[in-house]
């Protein structure tokens, strides 16, 4: 039912840092912000969703708070291109994880990762670990380190 290969990539990624025991797997789907929040028992905003945008032949990943939305104007100012998300059928081959499990851990080479300021409201956040039923709780310093992020950016808007 769940994609086993990708969670293994995610687990192996954290194993090298001695953090594999912090990876959580669920008997239920955590493929959307709402489902992940339910599985973890936390507010949806604390789910660090990973958004994948086309860039030439590859993509960039932006981690944002669960309640944040991409602000097209801010995105274009930052990246000098329109925000065009990868098609679902492109995600696995380009990023290395399936839709619902996309995260910056154990991804294909050559992908730039950015963290959106919307996450900074929280001490810890919960990104996926490569499958549609996984997560790991990380503080912001850990998220920055283990995602190999280039920088914190401001390309989202929060609900009014």
Stretch-by-stretch model annotation:
Residues 2-160:
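Extended, low-hydrophobicity, polar/charged segments
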């Amino acid at each position: 039912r769940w994609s086993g290969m990708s969670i293994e990539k995610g687990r192996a990624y954290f194993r090298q840092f001695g953090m594999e025991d912090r990876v959580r797997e669920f008997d239920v789907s955590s493929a959307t912000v709402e489902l992940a929040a339910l599985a973890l028992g936390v507010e949806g905003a604390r789910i660090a969703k990973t958004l994948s945008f086309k860039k030439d032949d590859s993509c960039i990943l932006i981690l944002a708070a669960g309640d944040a939305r991409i602000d097209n104007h801010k995105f274009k100012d930052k990246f000098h291109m329109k925000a065009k998300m990868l098609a679902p059928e492109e995600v696995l081959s380009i990023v290395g994880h399936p839709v619902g499990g996309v995260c910056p851990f154990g991804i294909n080479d050559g992908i730039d990762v950015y963290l959106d300021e919307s996450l900074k409201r929280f001490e810890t956040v919960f990104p996926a670990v490569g499958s549609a039923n996984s997560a790991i709780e990380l503080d912001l310093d850990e998220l920055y380190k283990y995602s190999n992020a280039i920088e914190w950016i401001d390309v989202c808007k929060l609900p009014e």
